[in-house]
From Swiss-Prot:
Organism: Pseudomonas putida (strain ATCC 47054 / DSM 6125 / CFBP 8728 / NCIMB 11950 / KT2440)
Gene: dapD
Principal place of residence: cytoplasm
Highest taxon of source: Bacteria
Protein name as annotated: 2,3,4,5-tetrahydropyridine-2,6-dicarboxylate N-succinyltransferase
Binding of Mg(2+), residues: E205
Protein residues bound to succinyl-CoA: R223, G238, S241, A264, E279, A280, G287, K304, R317, R318, N319, S320
Entry keyword set: Acyltransferase, Amino-acid biosynthesis, Cytoplasm, Diaminopimelate biosynthesis, Lysine biosynthesis, Magnesium, Metal-binding, Transferase
Pathway assigned to this chain's UniProt record: Amino-acid biosynthesis; L-lysine biosynthesis via DAP pathway; LL-2,6-diaminopimelate from (S)-tetrahydrodipicolinate (succinylase route): step 1/3
Length: 344
């Protein structure tokens, strides 16, 4: 067995009455843990290689804490706490970044993103949806939907209320980790698996999906859909939209470059280069016909928006007299044609 792992984490989670995992919380996930640490934990867990989620007991947690005292003080301290747990424990060891095969593995990779250990598209999430059970997220934690009605009745009979915040496959990120240096006005609008860079502010209308996020700093008042990554210094205006890779965006990875502004209620279905501006209310899809204007506001040619994907210093606007979508640049007609030719 190799002592090299892609990732390792010790977690505490929730299971339904059949013992199936509903969710897992990893306080201190590790990316590329040291060979010494792997060698210390493998015999205690009976790990012999591959990608595995191994349930372990409180007694094993204490053993692991002892084994790691001289190797990794932070992990040893965590395991000392886990040894006192009244909830089920699991160690997830990933030898490689491969397609997912269990719920604890899926939760570990979502944690890696939200802990900023990997960036969106930096880890394989293939097969994630069937492994994330649809769960009632309540003020008493994750509840299996088949067990919810009974628990609601039990709570009422005690004079209590079991409040259901959402019914979803993904929990909110802040119940698992709050990254340093961020503001999130409505935490329910950021899913676990979002990457929120330092200096990011997400206002009430902002939303960030899993495997998506921001480099930071930046202001998010619109929707950052699955797979979308927003560069530093960019501003997404109120109610604006970025087309995700899950619905409508196909396999095109939509990216927002640095220093961009997407106006209120605008939207993009193409990747933006640096310092692009999209006028409020204008939605650009890949097939949108665009009048390309040069530095003198002269028409150079009519192109599809996808031909302008990734180009820098563009202003997308709608002509209020004739409704045509225009792209204004600071370049000459010759420079524009060269840029388009290079892009193709």
């Amino acid at each position: 067995m190799s002592n090299t792992l892609f990732s390792l984490a010790f977690g505490v989670g929730s299971q339904n009455r059949q013992g199936a995992w509903l969710e897992v919380f990893y306080a201190q996930p590790l990316l590329n843990p040291s060979a010494e640490l792997v060698a210390a934990v493998a015999p205690v867990l009976g790990y012999e290689g591959g990608n595995q989620a191994i349930a372990f007991s409180n007694a094993q947690a204490a053993q692991l804490a002892e084994a790691l005292k001289g190797v990794d003080a932070a992990q040893a301290a965590l395991l000392t706490r886990l040894a006192e747990s009244h909830k089920p424990l699991v160690a997830t060891l990933l030898a490689e970044d491969a397609a997912l095969s269990s719920t604890p593995e899926a939760y570990l990779k979502l944690h890696l993103l939200s802990h900023r250990l990997v960036k969106p598209h930096g880890v394989s999430l293939a097969g994630i949806f069937p492994l994330l059970p649809n769960v009632a997220w309540t003020n008493q934690g994750a509840v299996d939907l088949g067990e919810l009605a009974e628990l609601q009745l039990e709570a009422r009979l005690k004079g209590e209320l079991l409040e259901v915040f959402s019914v979803d496959k993904f929990p909110k990120m802040t119940d698992y980790v709050v990254p340093a240096g961020v503001r999130i006005a409505d935490t329910a609008r950021v899913r676990l698996g979002a990457y929120i860079g330092e200096g990011t502010t997400i206002m009430h209308e902002g939303f960030v999906n899993f495997n998506a996020g921001t480099e930071g700093p930046g202001m998010i008042e619109g929707r950052v859909s699955a797979g979308v990554f927003v560069g530093k210094g960019s501003d997404l205006g109120g109610g604006c939209s970025t087309m995700g890779t899950l619905s409508g965006g196909g396999n095109i990875v939509i990216k927002v470059g640095e220093g961009c502004l997407i106006g209120a209620n605008a939207g993009i279905g193409i990747p933006l280069g640096d310092r692009n501006t999209v006028e409020a209310g204008l939605y650009i899809t890949a097939g949108t016909k665009v009048n390309l204007l040069d530095e003198n506001n002269e028409l150079v040619k009519v192109v599809k928006a996808r031909d302008l994907a990734g180009q820098t210093d563009l202003l997308f606007r709608r002509n209020s007299l004739n409704g045509a979508v225009e792209c204004k640049t600071h370049k000459s007609a010759i420079e524009l044609n060269e840029a388009l030719h290079a892009h193709n």
